[in-house]
Structure formats: structure tokens, C-alpha cells
């Protein structure tokens, strides 16, 4: 049994702990696993502070999508507490004006009762084209969205829109870092994952085949294997 650091997993937009369910059994064998709550605050700084207040003194940190934005904020606030970092289907860039405009429209629609319609549209960009008609994946995304709720969703979008540009801070990351993405991510193009990997000294990039924005349920075995290798060092 390895002496792996405790692991803190941070989900993404409209994602609950369920997003990590396909990989937790494998990761749990290596050490304690905690899934962070990221729906109680509406800024990256506040979300990161809350996670740090609840996390072990020193830990491995993995963030998926929005969770990657949060992970990069944690690296700004307390880099000495993070022994390993995994950035999954995420990016270091801030929101573009066009992306923020789309998010404001989503907030309006969710407030007006079209939350499920918004979730359906997000799902279409989340999964690999071959999985668009996968009822299991669609149900998973809708179940998670229900758990996050409209208020949590609005908080998440508010935090995402105001996130800082993390590209200038990538060179300060010194811990072993995995950058993982899918070959067909239509939400955050894998070119942006490659950009992060290029900016973090000593990091390594894993691109999963036949995978969109949700590698944990889309390619669970490959995702778990990559994360286990990262944890074991």
C-alpha cells in the first residue's frame, strides 16, 4: 500500500460528487478521498478559501473543468499545501466577453424556469459525439444538475465569469502536475490543456481517445489509471 497524500477532488460546472464516482473506488485504495463542495460561494477566491478550510493540512488536488479553475486559485492561495496537482479538461484563461455573455443568458433562463433546457444544451457540448444519445450519461448530467440546483448553478456561473487569468501563475507551480483531457472536448478544447502543460514545468499531458469533456464517466478506466499513476508518482 502506498503512502499517497489525501486526495481532494473538485467537480466542475453542474457537477456533484457523482462525476467522480466511476474513479473513486480505484483512487480510494491509495488513500483518503474527499470531494469538495463548490456550490456555496460565488467567487473563485471564496470557494478556494472554503475548500482549504475543510481540506487536510497537505493534500493532492484534482480539479475538473470549473474545478480546475478552483484548483488554480488554491495554488495561488496556498501552494505549500498542495503536494500534487491534476488539471482535468480545464484551462488557465479567463472568460472571454462572448463566453460571459452566454453565461448571463444561461442565468436568465435558469431564473425563468428553463434550467433543464440549459442543462440539455450543456450536455450536448460535454460528451463525445458518439455518446450524444447515451441515456446513462444524459441521466447522470441531469441528476447532478438537480443536486447542484438553480441557486448553486448561478453561483457557479458567477464565479466562472469573474475568474482571473491563471496563465501568468503557471510557472510558479512546482509540484508534480498531470494535465488530462479528451481528444474531442467541445467545451474546453484540448489545445488549452496543452497550453497549460507547456506552461507548467515538469508537467505531463494525457489525452484520452474517444473522450469529450467528462472523462470520468466517458473513459473511467483510462481516467482512473492516469490518476493512480499521478498519485503514485
Give the label of every model feature segment.
Residues 95-98, 113-172:
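Conserved alpha/beta-hydrolase catalytic His-Asp/Glu region
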Residues 194-213:
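Catalytic histidine neighborhood in serine/cysteine hydrolases
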Residues 44, 76-77, 81-120:
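Flexible "cap/lid" loop of the alpha/beta hydrolase fold
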Residues 175, 189-198:
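Short alpha-helix in the alpha/beta-hydrolase fold that links the catalytic acid
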Residues 63-67, 71:
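Gly/Ala-rich beta-loop-alpha elbow adjacent to hydrolase catalytic centers
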Residues 1-50, 64:
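Conserved HGGG/HGGXW glycine-rich cap/lid loop of the alpha/beta-hydrolase fold
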Residues 211-224:
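Catalytic histidine-centered segment of alpha/beta-hydrolase-like enzymes
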Residues 173, 179-181, 185:
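Short beta-strand/loop motif that positions the catalytic acidic residue
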Amino acid at each position: 500500500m502506498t503512502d499517497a497524500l489525501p486526495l481532494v477532488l473538485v467537480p466542475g460546472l453542474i457537477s456533484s460528487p457523482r462525476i467522480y464516482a466511476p474513479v473513486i473506488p480505484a483512487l480510494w485504495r491509495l488513500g483518503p478521498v474527499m470531494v469538495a463542495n463548490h456550490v456555496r460561494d460565488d467567487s473563485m477566491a471564496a470557494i478556494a478559501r472554503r475548500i482549504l478550510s475543510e481540506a487536510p493540512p497537505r493534500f493532492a488536488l484534482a480539479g475538473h473543468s470549473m474545478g480546475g479553475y478552483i484548483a488554480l486559485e488554491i495554488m495561488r492561495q496556498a501552494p505549500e499545501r498542495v503536494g500534487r496537482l491534476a488539471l482535468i479538461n480545464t484551462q488557465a484563461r479567463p472568460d472571454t466577453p462572448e463566453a460571459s455573455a452566454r453565461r448571463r443568458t444561461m442565468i436568465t433562463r435558469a431564473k425563468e424556469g428553463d434550467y433543464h433546457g440549459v442543462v440539455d444544451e450543456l450536455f450536448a457540448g460535454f460528451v463525445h459525439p458518439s455518446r450524444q444519445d447515451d441515456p446513462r450519461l444524459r441521466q447522470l448530467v441531469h441528476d447532478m444538475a438537480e443536486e447542484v440546483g438553480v441557486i448553486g448553478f448561478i453561483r457557479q456561473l458567477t464565479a466562472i465569469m469573474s475568474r482571473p487569468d491563471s496563465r501568468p501563475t503557471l510557472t510558479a507551480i512546482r509540484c508534480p502536475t498531470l494535465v488530462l483531457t479528451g481528444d474531442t472536448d467541445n467545451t474546453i478544447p484540448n489545445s488549452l490543456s496543452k497550453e497549460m502543460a507547456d506552461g507548467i514545468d515538469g508537467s505531463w499531458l494525457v489525452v484520452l481517445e474517444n473522450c469529450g469533456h467528462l472523462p470520468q464517466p466517458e473513459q473511467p478506466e483510462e481516467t482512473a489509471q492516469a490518476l493512480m499513476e499521478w498519485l503514485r508518482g
